[in-house]
């Protein structure tokens, strides 16, 4: 029988996954939109949207992960093991997938845009996303 704490953690975990998907898909939509931005349109609002969407995604996912980790620490040992085996690999896979797609879109922006400012910003964000993927893979997904 699962405890009340475990059910609460599972509920928050699923909400975290939904938030993560929505945040990253929003970021990807803005990034893909930047690809098709006409040359006559001022590029700074597009860059601002990309940066804000990326930062909001990272901050939201970090806060969610910290809340889930705090709740995870209050579980008994048998429920911790069940959570790790049942739910955690899915989160690592989703984060790797979304950040991986994000870095691909940003790299595409880098090499197809005629605007040097967008190229530099896209390259920096792609580098950050690739770093996040490597950290998640090394510390999390690899351990399973």
UniProtKB/Swiss-Prot annotation:
The chain crosses the membrane at residues 16-36, 48-68, 87-107, 120-140. It is found in: Cell membrane. It is a multi-pass membrane protein. It comes from the Archaea. Keywords: Cell membrane, Membrane, Plasmid, Transmembrane, Transmembrane helix. One of its GO terms (cellular component) is plasma membrane. The keyword Cell membrane applies. This is Uncharacterized protein MJECS05.
